Amino acid sequence: PTRRSSDLQQAEVADPALFYDHDTERRMILGEAIGLRAYMHFDLLRMYAPAPAANPNTRTFIPYVDKYPSYVNDKQTVSYCLEHAIADLKESQRILFDIDTESTNFNPDRRFVQKVAGEGAFAALRGYRLNYYAVTAILARVYLYAGMNDEAYAEAKKLIDEEEKTKYFAADESYYASDNFKNGNMKMYDNIIFALYSPTELVDWDSEINHLTDGKSESDQNYLSWSSKMLDAVYGIEKENDFRFKYQLESKYYGYNYRTLKYYKQVESTEYGKANNQIIPMIRMSEVYYIAAEAIYTEGDLLKIAEAKSYLEKVKKGRGIKTVDYSSVSSKNDFVNMIVNDARREFFGEGQTLYMFKRLNKVLTCDSGEIP
């Protein structure tokens, strides 16, 4: 966070003539630095402080560093940090709006694959940078975490409306998703709004953790896995149709265990293999639909309930589930549980499910029961 404050303070006063693309590039750096400051503080807050749902009150947990140089900073309350993160994200959003929305093409290949030669390379591959759409998605995430449902919905709706016009962040393209998986699109990167770039580290880690003993007998292999019992509980009757089960998991040990393939190194000669090997997902369009669904669902309001269901169905249908069963839903809590259930399939290995449980003050469980 301190480094980001340093970057933005320099960008604020720098002469635009120093930059290849002059003031556009200066503003891009400034907007990204402000957004990254909020992003990193928010993740630290989620990690080290209780969620608002746990009533942290006036206790203090982490500082919010917005000045450089800064040597010693007082810890602040959860509400203080959230207020400052929201303010930073709104300012970042304002600065980046013209830069990214004026682009005529923000499709997945432009975001993550197509490199640009020369000085223009700095402004390319915006999916690996904190672009306007990513800032908007993160602002929706922060608002929901803060319990500000109306504001969370408003930000999510901006992206949903954009997606309906441009199809930049395809969360619902079920007619080609299965072929994408087969051609190396294991992380569904077209759905990712913002990612980190990792040339080999992530696939190397997966190789060491999950595939080092592949040559041994089934009973002697070591890997991270889901149990069949856990999978049945999470996927239920949708299991056989869900692309995330069919393509992102591999049956092991006679069907008792299932190993994740999300980070398995893809063949780079396939259509999507190289891009998927390098991507670490940070926020997806599917999460934006989850946010909108949870935020708009209002008990007793049939129109809002129908709208909320349509957002969840966008994600599910894009994952091969053509019919969604709502027979277990009689309250908002039931509906939120459905969202959480789908998010567990969507986000495994991405670090978001834990914070969803924390935000909702839900108990974590495993095969043997509750996790302390």
Where are these regions (language model features)?
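Acidic/polar-rich alpha-helix caps and helix-coil junctions
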Residues: 3-210, 235-372
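Short, cationic low-complexity segments
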Residues: 214-232
